[in-house]
């Protein structure tokens, strides 16, 4: 298999692990910076160049796309798709998951439970918007934030109103959610590959914080997700069109609640904590999907 990995940084742990495992499996692998890919769009002739040379002949591409380059990098991924290259996470699926509002709407439509969420635009509606949510504490989230950045806990209604008005003044898109106190500032990261959860870790927020992201000083321990939690995680990934995803859940009195579905979850924390070789699970999944495609006589390139 000729495999491309879309990544801006070849030194990142996740990128290095995927390259290492794929080469160990006998595949030809190349890391491509999506911002150095440029494309020609012509009826019947989708093509792409990278640093002055044509890109062609790739059987699969694994996207490791950062939030800041989502728009351009998904256009590059879409061009790969139009050229007949398989991706475990298609461009449209990444766009769905990166837009928190859209993702929440799609998940709720599939009967997947989440913290109650409200969204609005006009400042005149702020008070009624918050009343739809219920009493504080409230969690205010930027619509396109990542790694816990742009997530604020508001413990008073007046503070929530002030935050909402300030963010609107900055023309920022955001959601406001109920705060689930019984989660005790912890969540589960369920790593989905294909139709199963291949690894799980429990993340606990640092003292004085409520965000459990490891990038913000949270800690992680090995965990086992219940059958219900695994089912919810897989359904959440598939509802957005993803086959590789990090699904973040919290445990509540009404069952598991989905916080977020990450289309490019990091491998370092989950592999170190769970002891699972997640990278090889991803490469195996790509191999299996390509075999299925080829057996259907539509194998490209």
Swiss-Prot record:
Provide the residue positions that the database annotates as binding ATP: 141, 178-179, 187, 211-213
Cofactor(s), by name: Mg(2+); Mn(2+)
User: Where is Mn(2+) 2 bound in this sequence?
Assistant: 260, 262
**Residues bound to Mn(2+) 1:** 248, 260
Q: How is the cofactor bound?
A: Binds 2 magnesium or manganese ions per subunit.
State the Gene Ontology terms under molecular function: ATP binding; metal ion binding; ribosomal S6-glutamic acid ligase activity
Residues annotated for Mg(2+) 1 binding in this entry? 248, 260
InterPro entries membership:
ATP-grasp (IPR011761), ATP-grasp_RimK-type (IPR013651), ATP_grasp_subdomain_1 (IPR013815), RimK (IPR023533), Rimk_N (IPR041107), Rp_bS6_RimK/Lys_biosynth_LsyX (IPR004666)
Domain called ATP-grasp: residue spans: 104-287
Key words of the record: ATP-binding, Ligase, Magnesium, Manganese, Metal-binding, Nucleotide-binding, Protein biosynthesis
Under PANTHER family, the record lists:
RIBOSOMAL PROTEIN BS6--L-GLUTAMATE LIGASE (PTHR21621:SF7), RIBOSOMAL PROTEIN S6 MODIFICATION PROTEIN (PTHR21621)
- State the name under which the record lists this protein: Probable alpha-L-glutamate ligase
């Amino acid at each position: 298999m000729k495999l491309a990995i879309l990544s801006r940084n070849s030194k990142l742990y996740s990128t290095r692990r995927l390259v290492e495992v794929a080469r160990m499996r006998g595949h030809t692998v190349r890391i491509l910076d999506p911002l150095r890919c440029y494309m020609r769009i012509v009826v019947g002739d989708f093509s792409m160049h990278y640093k002055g040379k044509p890109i062609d002949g790739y059987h699969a591409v694994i996207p490791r796309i950062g939030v800041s380059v989502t728009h351009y990098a998904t256009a590059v991924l879409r061009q790969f798709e139009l050229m007949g290259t398989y991706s475990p996470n298609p461009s449209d699926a990444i766009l769905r998951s990166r837009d928190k509002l859209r993702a929440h709407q799609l998940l709720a439509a599939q009967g997947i439970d989440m913290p109650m969420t409200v969204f609005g635009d006009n400042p005149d509606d702020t008070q009624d918007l918050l009343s739809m949510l219920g009493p504080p504490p409230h969690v205010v989230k930027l619509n396109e934030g990542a790694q816990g950045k742009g997530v604020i806990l508001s413990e008073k209604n007046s503070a929530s109103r002030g935050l909402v008005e300030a963010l609107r003044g900055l023309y920022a898109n955001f959601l406001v959610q109920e705060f689930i106190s019984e989660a005790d500032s912890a969540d589960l990261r369920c790593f989905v590959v294909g139709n199963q959860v291949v690894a799980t870790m429990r993340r606990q927020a640092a003292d004085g914080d409520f965000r459990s992201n490891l990038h913000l000083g949270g800690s992680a321990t090995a965990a086992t997700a219940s059958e219900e939690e695994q089912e919810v995680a897989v359904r959440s990934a598939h509802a957005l069109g993803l086959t590789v995803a990090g699904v973040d859940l919290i445990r509540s009195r009404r069952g598991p609640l989905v916080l977020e579905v990450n289309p490019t979850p990091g491998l370092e924390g989950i592999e170190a904590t769970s002891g699972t070789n997640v990278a090889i699970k991803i490469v195996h999944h790509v191999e299996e999907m390509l075999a299925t495609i080829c057996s259907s006589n539509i194998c490209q390139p």
